[in-house]
């Protein structure tokens, strides 16, 4: 699915990192469920709703709360993992609007990042969820 999205449809926000479903760079939502795009045959999404990083913002001139929080909190550096991180976090917040820090860590374990050390990613997710740890 990731190759189809990138090469045939031109949605290049979905990255291909490991091609074995381990890194999370290819994360997409299928009917709202988080999936690894690199492992998913395109035929399996026929007739289903597929959301990539390009589809989570309310409009082309606005960012989603997660995209905005990642920018404000510095939740990315090189950017290879960013779309997968944001898609995974979108799925998390759809299921759990106010996750604990431990719940965020557990949920995001399938998304690898070699740059940030994860703290700023977690801070970004908390900010998007409206969680202020200084007051918790």
Specify the residue positions occupied by each region the protein language model found.
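Signature of N-terminal electron-transfer/Fe-S-associated modules in redox systems
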Residues: 2-136
């Amino acid at each position: 699915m990731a190759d189809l999205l990138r090469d045939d449809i031109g949605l290049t926000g979905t990255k291909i990192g490991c091609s074995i479903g381990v890194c999370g760079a290819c994360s997409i939502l299928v009917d709202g469920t988080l999936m690894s795009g690199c492992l998913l045959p395109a035929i399996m999404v026929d007739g289903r709703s597929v959301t990539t990083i390009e589809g989570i913002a309310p409009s082309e001139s606005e960012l989603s709360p997660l995209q905005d929080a990642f920018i404000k909190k510095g939740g990315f550096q090189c950017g290879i993992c960013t779309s997968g991180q944001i898609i995974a976090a979108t799925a998390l917040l759809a299921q759990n609007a106010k996750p604990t820090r431990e719940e965020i860590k557990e949920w995001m374990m399938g998304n690898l990042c070699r740059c940030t050390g994860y703290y700023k990613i977690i801070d970004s997710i908390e900010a998007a969820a409206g969680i202020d740890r200084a007051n918790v």
